[in-house]
Amino acid sequence: MNPSNPAASAPHSRAPSRFAQFYALTKPRVVQLIVFCALIGMVLAVPHVPTWPEVKLALIACAGIWLVAGAAAAFNCIVEQRIDARMRRTAWRPTAKGELSNPLTLAFSAALCAAGSVILYVWVNPLTMWLTFATFVGYAVVYTVILKPLTPQNIVIGGASGAMPPVLGWAAMTGTVGPEALILFLIIFLWTPPHFWALALYRVEDYRKSGLPMLPVTHGNEFTRLQVFLYTLVLFAACLMPFVFKMSGWLYLVVAVVLSVGFSWHAWRLWRSYSDALARKTFRFSLIHLSVLFAALLLDHYLV
């Protein structure tokens, strides 16, 4: 999932402990959402109430995915250390403040990635390990190092790595990647641009100072607002796919329609008349949209 979430962590009011500094590097709230989406993939991959061995497998897989996701977040902090220091939203991070050295942070990232990869390979399955490692490379290297400073479409192309968690979860439980997992991938992939660009709209000065070619900086406010609205319409259609392809029932469909109408309505208002407050509301609703959508999919799977 994408690290742009400003709620991913919060500045400390006093000098944090060394443990707190390392923990902050993993962007814990972002990782929690990643693991939640992976868990949705795991649950949907099992057509019945999970047995204890399946529950144990899911817990082990969540631990491995959490470690590798945390490693990617820590690596991101190294690459974007100078950029983070120039942005109010990220200037508090331990690497940006110089509280943790780059070699130490790199060693921490490598240790997390290695531990998570071993857990997934030995106790889950090799496919999940390789897919998770590919996601690490996609986010930490392809997105952060190459795409983010190169193109305003960075979040669209790089969003593929952020959309992988349900696929990882599905692979963990089945050893394969089914079409249902790809539908979940598509939903997150299409959700990411309007989610991120809503944030970038009201943080545009931060991104301008950073020198990153984000869409509101390169193409302007009005163009970005239109893109946010258009993406919510395409996302609306994608959110109906679990029902169309028999992955869910009417409970999910009703929730998906309500959430999608709500997201598109926020985006339409933002497109028609801009304010930072509306952009912030749209961003926050996007978080509600994805979390509640997947929770509804989970409830529908077991209760209906």
From Swiss-Prot:
Keywords: Cell inner membrane, Cell membrane, Heme biosynthesis, Membrane, Transferase, Transmembrane, Transmembrane helix. Gene3D superfamilies: UbiA prenyltransferase. GO terms for molecular function: protoheme IX farnesyltransferase activity. The chain crosses the membrane at residues 30-50, 59-79, 104-124, 127-147, 155-175, 181-201, 222-242, 243-263, 283-303. Its EC number is 2.5.1.141. Pathway: Porphyrin-containing compound metabolism; heme O biosynthesis; heme O from protoheme: step 1/1. It is found in: Cell inner membrane. InterPro entries: Protohaem_IX_farnesylTrfase, UbiA_prenyltransferase, UbiA_prenylTrfase_CS, UbiA_sf. It is a multi-pass membrane protein. GO terms for biological process: heme O biosynthetic process. One of its GO terms (cellular component) is plasma membrane. Its main location: membrane. It catalyses: heme b + (2E,6E)-farnesyl diphosphate + H2O = Fe(II)-heme o + diphosphate. It comes from the Bacteria. NCBIfam families: cyoE_ctaB, PRK04375.1-2. Converts heme B (protoheme IX) to heme O by substitution of the vinyl group on carbon 2 of heme B porphyrin ring with a hydroxyethyl farnesyl side group. Belongs to the UbiA prenyltransferase family. Protoheme IX farnesyltransferase subfamily. Carbon 2 of the heme B porphyrin ring is defined according to the Fischer nomenclature. This is Protoheme IX farnesyltransferase. It comes from Polaromonas sp. (strain JS666 / ATCC BAA-500).
